[in-house]
Amino acid sequence: MWVVLVVGILNKESDRGKVHTLRQKLQEIPSDLHELFRDILTRDSHDKDELVLCIQWVLFSKQPLSPEQLYHAIYASTNPRAVTDWDPEDITKDVVKRFILSSSKGLAEVTVSKEPKAQFIHESVRDFLFKENGLGKIWPELGGNFQGQSHERLKQCCLNYISVDVAEFLKGPDKLPRAPSQQAASLRKLATQMLPFLEYAMHNVLYHADTAEGGGISQAGFLDSFPLPR
C-alpha cells in the first residue's frame, strides 16, 4: 500500500512538470505507512471540511454509499445548492469518481463492480483513522468524541437533504399518484435518478440521530422538531 501511494504522489509531481524534484520528493515521503497517511491528510488545508466529511461518511454510513450518494451526501452539507443543480448528464460518473478521489486526498476509491460503492483504498486507512484515532491526533479540534460528533453531522446532512423541496425539484404532479400505480413507480425512479441520496437520508436520519445519542449527544431538541407522524 505504501508503494501504491508513493507512486501516485510521484506521478502527480511528474504530471506537474516537476521531474527534477522527484528524488527530493521521494526522500521527503515518510517510510512508515501511517505517517504517510498523516502526511497526505495534513499536506494542505484545501477543502478540509470536504475531506473530513468524506471520511466521516465512508467510516460511519450505515451501509456503503454509491459514488453518487456520497457526492450528494457531501454537498448536502458543504454546498446545498449543488443538490438542486444536479444534472446527471453534466455530472458524469467520471466527474463523481474524480470528486471522491480529490475529496478524500486519494484515500477513498470507487469499486469496480456491477453496483459501485465508495470505500477506502485499503483497510489500513480505516485502522489508522478510527482504531488508532488518527483523525483525533491530526485534528484535535474535532474533539475526543469523534464518532458521536460524526453521527451528529451525518444526521444533519440527511436532514438537509430531505428538506429539499422534492415536488418543485422533480416538477411532478400537484397530487401524488397512488402508490401501486405506474405513475408512482415512474416518479420514484425519477427521484432516485435526480436525488440519489434521498432514500438513504429518509431511511437513516433517525439511525444517525440514535447513534449520536448513544455517543452522548442529546437529540431531545431534534426529536421535538422532527416531523414524526402523530
Regions found by a protein language model. Name each.
Residues 1-230:
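Leucine/isoleucine-rich amphipathic helices and adjacent mixed helix/strand linkers
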